[in-house]
């Protein structure tokens, strides 16, 4: 409702003042004019020292971010990490950012090798310390890595959002199987009693 944006006029002699409040998320393009009772219009306002007084954006809503790997889609900051993504080759996580009002300023990521979820305060510290990298390609976890991908998107209004993937394990090393037969038989594979076979798997 535009009528709620403008306050009532306050008159002090020949000076009339009203306040216009832009408090809803939107891209604003507006103008101002005034005409007195004699039909005389005000001169054009000098705005040469102001950047964009008649065209600006109010955006108080954080942008959204999706991290995607195959059929897995993450769109929030997970509070609990479980390592449910397994692969024997590279795992490439794609980031897709969206903002309905402001343009996207940056998308960055941090590859975390721990096994507990990080909160927003911890992620802010990592970001401020330069631990996030600008995103310009799929984010990769290579064989031999255990990782959680943290994404960060920021718009030009300064709003930002963190999103995390679930735990990822990339492993291209084949497991090793061992057998141990007890008791040992120096005469070969024929026994006249019980045989215990211990099977071991190392991965």
Can you say where each PLM-predicted feature lies in the sequence?
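Low-complexity, disordered linker/stalk regions enriched in Pro/Thr/Ser/Gly
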Residues: 1-203
């Amino acid at each position: 409702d535009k009528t709620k944006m403008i306050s009532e006029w306050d008159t002090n002699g020949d000076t009339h003042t009203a306040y216009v409040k832009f408090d809803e998320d939107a891209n604003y393009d507006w103008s101002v004019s005034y005409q007195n009772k004699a039909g005389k219009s005000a001169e054009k306002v000098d705005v040469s020292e102001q950047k964009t007084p008649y065209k600006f954006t109010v955006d108080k809503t954080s942008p959204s971010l999706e991290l995607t790997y195959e059929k897995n889609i993450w769109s929030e900051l997970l509070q609990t990490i479980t390592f449910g993504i397994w692969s024997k080759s590279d795992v490439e996580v794609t980031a897709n950012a969206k903002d309905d009002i402001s343009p996207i300023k940056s998308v960055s990521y941090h590859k975390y090798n721990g096994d507990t979820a990080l909160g927003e305060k911890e992620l802010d510290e990592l970001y401020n310390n330069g631990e996030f990298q600008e995103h310009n390609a799929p984010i990769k976890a290579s064989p031999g890595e255990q990782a959680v991908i943290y994404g960060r998107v920021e718009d030009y209004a300064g709003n930002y959002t963190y999103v995390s993937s679930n735990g990822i394990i990339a492993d291209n090393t084949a497991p090793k199987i061992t057998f141990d037969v007890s008791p040992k038989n120096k005469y070969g594979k024929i026994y006249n009693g019980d045989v215990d076979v211990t099977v071991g798997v190392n991965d």
